[in-house]
Swiss-Prot record:
Gene Ontology cellular component terms for the protein in this record: cytosol
Protein name according to UniProt: Translation initiation factor IF-2
HAMAP family found in the cross-reference section: IF_2_B
Sequence segments annotated as region (G2): 443-447
Comp. bias intervals (Basic and acidic residues): 94-108, 120-138, 176-185, 193-238, 270-280, 294-303
Biased composition (Polar residues): 65-84
Predominant subcellular localization, coarse grouping: cytoplasm
Region ranges (Disordered): 52-318
Matches recorded under SUPFAM superfamilies: Initiation factor IF2/eIF5b, domain 3, P-loop containing nucleoside triphosphate hydrolases, Putative DNA-binding domain, Translation proteins
Lineage: Bacteria, Pseudomonadati, Pseudomonadota, Gammaproteobacteria, Moraxellales
Gene3D superfamilies: P-loop containing nucleotide triphosphate hydrolases (3.40.50.300), Putative DNA-binding domain, N-terminal subdomain of bacterial translation initiation factor IF2 (3.30.56.50), Translation factors (2.40.30.10), Translation initiation factor IF- 2, domain 3 (3.40.50.10050)
Keywords, comma-separated and alphabetical: Cytoplasm, GTP-binding, Initiation factor, Nucleotide-binding, Protein biosynthesis
Length: 908
C-alpha cells in the first residue's frame, strides 16, 4: 500500500474528497487537503477506525490449514498387502497480540524488575553493613590486644632496658621489633638471630605467646563467621523447602539425620563452600565454579519440585541380612501350600520340592494337614504354631458382652411346618386377617416369611417354611431357630413324606410340637385316621393319653384358630422364655435377597438384645452397618427387641439363610472374623475339590459318553436358590449331568444373558424377571429366558431337557426264522439255499444272522429272496423260499434269523 493523496483515496472508495477528509479527522489524523499525501501507516489507522465504527474488530487470529496425502502398504489378516491412502491434516493458528495487553505485560515486567533490583540493592547493603560490623569488631579486638601488649613491654623495658613490639600486618605476617635502651631503632625478625642472648630468648618467648593468642583469636573469629553463615544458609533453605512441603514427595524418616534431608543437602554444600572461602580468606569463587554450582543447584531444585530426593540421601541400598530370620508360622488344621510358603517368606516351589522328598506330590493350591505342615516348617528352620480353626470364633464369643441384668420375658417364635398343599400359608393368612389391624392387613410381604401378631395372651412371632421336598434345609433351619413347631396335617390327606420329615426335624432340634389338623370343613375329613398315623410315628395326642397338644382347625372358615393360639400361649408360658433386653443383639438370618434400588436386603430374627439402626452387624462372611430397618409391614423402625423379625439394609452381600448374626463394636474384629470365615469357606471348597479329583479323572475318561446341561439360575431369595441347587444336583445321572454355570439372587441382568450365550446354557429365573437391557440382549441373541414361580415346573422342565439329551435305547427284535433244507448251486448267485419259514416273516432288506448248532457264525444281509423263481420282499410262516446270503456259503441244517434294531426314547 503506497502513499496516496486524499483525492486518490476518494476515487478508490468512490466517495467525495470532503467525506474522506472528514473520516481522517474522525480517525484522529490531522486535516489534509485534497492534494496532501496520506502515508501507509495513516491509511492502516483509517481502515482500522472504519472497521471498528462499523462493528468489525481487527482480525487478530489467522488460521492456516494444510493437508498432505501419502500412500502406505498395509498387510491384512490373510497375508496380502494393499495400499491405503493416508491423509494428514494440520492446522496452525497465529494470533496477533493485543497492544494494550502487551503494554500491561511490559509494565508489569518492568515493575517486577525494579522491585527485584531494589531487593538486590537492599541485600547488598545489608551484607556490606554486616561485613563492616564484623571488621570493626575484629579491629577492636586487635587494638585491645595491642594495648595489653604495650603495657607488658613497658614493664619489660624497666627490667631489661629492652623495648619489644609486635606488629601485625595485613596478610597474616608478624614482625617483632626489639629496641635496646638509648640505642638507635633496629628491626629484627624472630627467625634470623644467630646467637641467642637472654634478651632475645625473652623476646622469643613473648613473641610465641602473642602468636598463640593471635591464632586463638583468629580461630574464634572464623568460627563465629562460620556460625553466622550457617544460620543465614539454614534460614534461606528453610524458606526454599517450605515451598514444597505440600507436595507428596518422598517422606523423610523420623530417624533420618538433618544432613540427609532436603535442607541438609543444601546445608552441607553451603557449609563446605563457607569453609573453603574462610580458609582461602576470600568469599569469591571462580566463574567456572559458580556456573557449575549454579547448574547443580538448579538441577536439585528441579528434582525437589518433581518430588525427587537426592540419590545420595534417599536411594535405598539393599543389604543382605547376615543372620537367617526365623518366623513363628501359624498353621491351621488345613492350609494350602501357597499360604504356607507365604508365611515362611519362601517360594511355593521350595515347599513342593520338600513335599516330594517326603513322598507327597502336591500342587500350590492343594491342601495339606497340620501335621505335615508342621514338619515342613521345622525342616525349613522356622517355629510352627498350631492354631485351632475355632480359636477366632471362640474369641468372638468371648468378646460379645452379654449384659443379662435386664432379663425379660420374650414372645415365642412359632414355625409352621407340614406337607405341601396342607394349608400352612392359608392358616397364616387367616391368623393375619383376624389378628392384625385393618390398616396393616396388606403390609406383609411374601418373601420375609416372618411376622408377629398380638393376641389376648401376648405377642406371637410366626415363621413360614415351604413344604416342598427341595426345601428340606430351610425347614431344618426353621426348626433350629424356633421355640415351638406347629405341624399342619390335612384331615383329608393324612401323613405325607414332608410331614414325617418335619417331625424328625422337630425332634432333632428338641422343639415342642403342636399338631393342627386342618381342613376340618371338608366332607372327606377323617381326623381319626390322622391320629392313628401320627401315633404310628410316636406322636400321641393328649386326648389319647400322650403329651402332644392337638387342635382341629379350618383355615378356610377360621374354626379352631383361637384354640390353636391358646395352646401356643400356654406352651410358651410353660417354657418360660426369657432374653436380655439390653446389650448387643444376636439372632439368625431368616432370608436374604437382592432388590434393585435397595441392594442386599436381609431378613433377621432377633433372639437376644436390641438391634438398633447404625449398629455394626456381622452375619456369616459379611459385615456392615445397619443403614435402615423395616418391620414386616414395610414401616421404618429404629430398634427391634428379642423375637422380633426385621429387614435390615447395609450388608455388602447376601449372607446364607440360617447363618447367625451379632452386633460388634470393634470394626477391626468384625473384619478379622469375616476374613477368617471367607478363608475357611475357600479351604473347604478346596478340600471338596481334592476329594473329587479321583472322580473327576474317571469323568474325564468317560467325557465322550457324558452330556452336560449348562444352567444359569437366578432366584428371588437365598433360601430358594439353595433349595433349587440341591434339587438340580440330585437330577444328574451317569449320562447327563446338570452343571450350574452361575447362580445368584436378584433380577436377570445383561451379564447373565451374555454368560448363558457364551457357555450355551439355559437361563432360568425363579420368581424374578429380566430387566430391559437383558431382554434386548436375549432378543438379539435369539435366546429364550424361562420364568417359573413354582418349583415343580422348573424341575420338570429340566428333567425333560435332560431326557432329550439322553442317547436313545436300542432294542433288537427277531422278525422271522427259516430252516435251510437244501443247498444248490446257481450260476448267478453261487450257493443258494432252499428254506422253510418256521417262525415270523423273512424280509429281504433286513439284517440276518446265520446260526449253526444254535451259535451265531455270521451276520450280514440277504442277497436274494425268491419264491417260485420270482423276487419277493417277504415270505411268511409255513412257506418255502430260496435265498442267497451275500458273502457267505450256508449249509443244510443252518438257521437264518432275520432281525431289526429299534430305537426307544429314554426319560429320567
Amino acid at each position: 500500500m503506497a502513499d496516496k493523496t486524499v483525492k486518490e483515496l476518494a476515487d478508490m472508495v468512490s466517495k467525495t474528497a470532503s467525506a474522506v477528509q472528514q473520516q481522517l479527522v474522525d480517525a484522529g489524523l490531522p486535516a489534509r487537503a485534497e492534494g496532501d499525501l496520506v502515508t501507509e501507516l495513516e491509511q492502516e489507522k483509517l481502515v482500522t477506525y472504519l472497521k471498528q465504527s462499523h462493528g468489525q474488530e481487527e482480525k487478530r487470529r489467522i488460521s492456516l490449514k494444510s493437508k498432505t496425502t501419502s500412500t502406505a502398504r498395509v498387510t491384512g489378516s490373510s497375508g496380502k498387502s494393499k495400499s491405503v491412502n493416508v491423509e494428514v491434516r494440520k492446522k496452525k493458528v497465529f494470533e496477533k497480540p493485543d497492544p494494550e495487553k502487551m503494554a500491561e505485560e511490559l509494565a508489569a515486567r518492568e515493575q517486577a524488575m525494579i522491585e527485584s533490583q531494589a531487593r538486590a540493592a537492599k541485600d547488598a547493603e545489608d551484607r556490606a553493613a554486616t561485613k563492616k560490623k564484623s571488621e570493626e569488631r575484629q579491629a577492636a579486638t586487635l587494638a585491645a590486644m595491642r594495648a595489653s601488649l604495650g603495657s607488658s613491654k613497658k614493664s619489660d623495658d624497666k627490667n631489661d632496658d629492652i623495648s619489644t613490639s609486635v606488629v601485625v600486618k595485613k596478610g597474616g605476617k608478624t614482625t617483632i621489633e626489639v629496641k635496646p635502651k638509648d640505642q638507635p631503632k633496629k628491626k629484627v625478625t624472630a627467625t634470623k638471630p644467630k646467637v641467642e642472648t637472654a634478651v632475645e630468648r625473652k623476646a622469643r618467648e613473648v613473641r610465641e605467646k602473642e602468636e598463640a593468642r593471635l591464632r586463638e583469636i583468629e580461630t574464634e573469629t572464623r568460627r563465629t563467621q562460620a556460625e553466622e553463615a550457617q544460620k543465614r544458609t539454614l534460614e534461606q533453605m528453610r524458606k526454599m523447602a517450605g515451598q514444597y512441603t505440600d507436595q507428596p514427595a518422598t517422606e523423610v524418616r523420623k530417624d533420618e539425620p538433618l544432613a540427609e534431608g532436603l535442607v541438609g543437602d543444601a546445608l552441607e554444600e553451603s557449609f563446605e563452600k563457607e569453609r573453603r572461602e574462610i580458609k582461602r580468606g576470600t568469599s569469591t569463587t571462580s566463574a567456572r565454579g559458580r556456573g557449575r554450582r549454579k547448574n547443580q543447584d538448579e538441577r536439585e531444585i528441579k528434582n525437589r519440585k518433581n518430588g525427587l530426593r537426592s540419590s545420595q540421601s534417599s536411594q535405598h541400598k539393599f543389604e543382605k541380612p547376615v543372620e537367617k530370620i526365623v518366623y513363628d508360622v501359624e498353621i491351621s488344621e488345613q492350609i494350602t501350600v501357597s499360604d504356607l510358603a507365604q508365611r515362611m517368606a519362601v517360594k511355593a516351589r521350595e515347599v513342593t520340592k520338600l513335599l516330594m522328598k517326603m513322598g507327597e506330590i502336591a500342587r500350590e493350591s492343594d491342601m495339606i494337614d497340620q501335621a505335615t505342615a508342621s514338619l515342613i516348617v521345622e525342616e525349613m528352620g522356622h517355629n510352627p504354631v498350631p492354631v485351632s480353626d475355632t480359636k477366632v470364633e471362640d474369641d468372638l464369643q468371648d468378646a460379645v458382652d452379654e449384659r443379662s441384668s435386664n432379663v425379660q420375658t420374650r414372645p415365642p417364635v412359632v414355625t409352621i411346618m407340614g406337607h405341601v398343599d396342607h394349608g400352612k400359608t392359608s392358616l397364616l393368612d387367616k391368623i393375619r386377617e383376624t389378628k392384625v389391624a385393618t390398616g396393616e392387613a396388606g403390609g406383609i410381604t411374601q418373601h420375609i416369611g416372618a411376622y408377629h401378631v398380638k393376641t389376648a395372651r401376648g405377642v406371637i412371632t410366626f415363621l413360614d417354611t415351604p413344604g416342598h421336598a427341595a426345601f428340606s434345609a430351610m425347614r431344618s433351619r426353621g426348626a433350629q431357630a424356633t421355640d415351638i413347631v406347629v405341624l399342619v396335617v390335612a384331615a383329608d390327606d393324612g401323613m405325607m413324606p414332608q410331614t414325617e420329615e418335619a417331625i424328625d426335624h422337630a425332634r432333632a432340634a428338641g422343639t415342642p410340637l403342636i399338631v393342627a389338623i386342618n381342613k376340618m370343613d371338608k366332607p372327606s375329613a377323617d381326623p381319626d385316621r390322622v391320629l392313628n398315623e401320627l401315633t404310628a410315628k410316636e406322636v400321641v395326642s393328649e386326648d389319647w393319653g400322650g403329651d402332644t397338644p392337638m387342635a382341629r382347625i379350618s383355615a378356610k372358615t377360621g374354626d379352631g384358630i383361637d384354640e390353636l393360639l391358646e395352646l401356643i400361649s400356654l406352651q410358651a408360658e410353660l417354657m418360660e422364655l426369657e432374653a436380655p433386653l439390653d446389650g448387643p443383639a444376636q439372632g439368625v438370618v431368616i432370608e436374604s435377597r437382592l432388590e434393585k434400588g435397595r441392594g442386599p436386603v436381609v431378613s433377621v430374627l432377633v433372639k437376644k438384645g436390641t438391634l438398633k439402626q447404625g449398629d455394626l452387624v456381622l452375619a456369616g462372611e459379611y459385615y456392615g452397618k445397619v443403614r435402615a430397618m423395616t418391620d414386616e409391614h414395610g414401616k421404618r423402625i429404629q430398634s427391634a427387641g428379642p423375637s422380633i423379625p426385621v429387614e435390615i439394609l447395609g450388608l455388602p452381600e447376601t449372607p446364607a439363610a440360617g447363618s447367625e448374626f451379632l452386633v460388634l463394636t470393634d470394626e477391626k474384629k468384625a473384619r478379622e472374623v469375616a476374613d477368617f470365615r471367607t478363608n475357611r469357606e475357600r479351604e473347604r471348597q478346596l478340600e471338596r475339590q481334592n476329594a473329587m479329583r479321583l472322580e473327576s479323572m474317571f469323568d474325564q475318561m468317560e467325557q465322550g459318553n457324558v452330556s452336560y446341561l449348562n444352567i444359569v439360575l437366578k432366584t428371588d431369595v437365598r433360601g430358594s436358590l439353595e433349595a433349587l441347587l440341591a434339587a438340580l444336583n440330585e437330577l444328574s445321572t451317569d449320562e447327563v449331568k446338570v452343571r450350574v454355570i452361575s447362580s445368584g439372587v436378584g433380577p436377570i441382568s445383561e451379564s447373565d444373558v451374555t454368560l448363558a450365550e457364551s457357555s450355551e446354557a439355559v437361563l432360568l429365573g425363579f420368581n424374578v424377571r429380566a430387566d430391559a437391557t437383558a431382554r434386548r440382549k436375549s432378543d438379539s441373541a435369539n435366546m429364550d429366558i424361562r420364568y417359573y414361580s413354582v418349583i415343580y415346573g422348573l424341575i420338570d422342565d429340566v428333567k425333560a431337557a435332560m431326557s432329550g439329551m439322553l442317547a436313545p435305547e436300542h432294542r433288537e427284535k427277531i422278525l422271522g426264522v427259516a430252516d435251510v433244507r437244501e443247498v444248490f448251486r446257481s450260476s448267478k448267485f453261487g450257493a443258494a439255499a432252499g428254506c422253510m419259514v418256521v417262525e415270523g416273516t423273512i424280509y429281504r432288506n433286513k439284517p440276518i444272522r446265520v446260526l449253526r448248532n444254535d451259535q451265531v457264525i455270521f451276520t450280514g444281509q440277504l442277497q436274494s429272496l425268491r419264491r417260485y423263481k420270482e423276487d419277493v420282499n417277504e415270505v411268511r410262516t409255513g412257506m418255502e423260499c430260496g435265498l442267497a446270503v451275500r458273502g457267505y456259503d450256508v449249509e443244510a441244517g443252518d438257521k437264518i434269523e432275520v432281525f431289526e434294531i429299534q430305537e426307544f426314547a429314554r426319560t429320567i
